[in-house]
Curated annotation (Swiss-Prot):
HAMAP family: Guanylate_kinase
Location(s) in or outside the cell: Cytoplasm
Name of the protein: Guanylate kinase
Residue ranges of domain Guanylate kinase-like in the record: 5-183
Family (UniProt): Belongs to the guanylate kinase family.
SMART domains: GuKc
GO cellular component: cytosol
Protein EC: 2.7.4.8
List of residues binding ATP: A12, P13, S14, G15, A16, G17, K18, S19
Reaction(s) the record says it catalyses: GMP + ATP = GDP + ADP
Highest taxon in the source lineage: Bacteria
Gene: gmk
Presence of keyword ATP-binding: yes
Length: 206
């Protein structure tokens, strides 16, 4: 079904800067709303329930799966992540633009359901920089960092499945690129026709 709102789906390997870019975009564009995913992993640092993620027990997550409450869900780095079907559909059905941070598996699955979803992949400028960012983050052991780098090879190979790719070398430039993608999507004929349906009908544009 065509909804008037736009759905932007952002994926990246750990350490590429996805969350920082999305946060910066939302500070610049108040018209875009975050879609908060559910996860079984524990909070990191200053993360809060309902802000970065809804943190669930495995049993709570199982219950949502059984109720078919997730648009998609997947195993990522040893934990489960899911996207609430109701949260997404309600917002874009009311003309809201929604941005979702998710893994590449979930992004591709969402595109199958919402064909108008805009998939954006964030790449690091190099393997060396990706390793350095993971180390500077200070959240993972050396063993976990190596696992994340190994998984990153698989994840980045899927960038070809996405509509847009941003290389996050200079943060300010990457934010500009992300904002440009959002603005350009809103001006596409198909997006304008969905968002401004009454205007198109009044102008007799099919």
């Amino acid at each position: 079904m065509d909804y008037p709102g736009n759905l932007f789906v952002v994926a990246a390997p750990s350490g590429a800067g996805k969350s920082s870019l999305v946060k910066a975009l939302m500070e610049l564009d108040s018209a875009i709303q975050p879609a908060v995913s559910h996860t079984t992993r524990p909070p990191r640092g200053q993360e809060k329930h309902g802000r970065e993620y809804f943190f669930l027990s495995p049993e709570e997550f199982d219950s949502m799966v059984q109720r078919d409450a997730f648009l998609e869900w997947a195993h990522v780095h040893g934990h489960r992540y899911g996207t609430s079907r109701q949260a997404i559909e309600e917002r874009i059905a009311h003309g809201k633009d929604v941005i979702l941070e998710i893994d590449f598996q979930g992004a591709i699955n969402i595109k199958r359901i919402f064909s108008n979803a805009v998939l954006i992949f964030i790449l690091p400028p190099s393997w060396e920089e990706l390793r350095s960012r993971l180390q500077r983050r200070g959240e993972d052991s050396p063993e976990v960092i190596e696992l994340r780098l190994k998984n990153a090879a698989t994840e980045m190979a899927q960038a070809r499945e996405f509509d847009f790719v941003i290389i996050n070398e200079l943060f300010e430039r990457a934010v500009f690129d992300l904002k440009t993608i959002v603005h350009a999507q809103r001006l596409k004929f198909s997006a304008q026709r969905r968002a401004r349906a009454e205007t198109f009908r009044a102008l007799q544009i099919p």
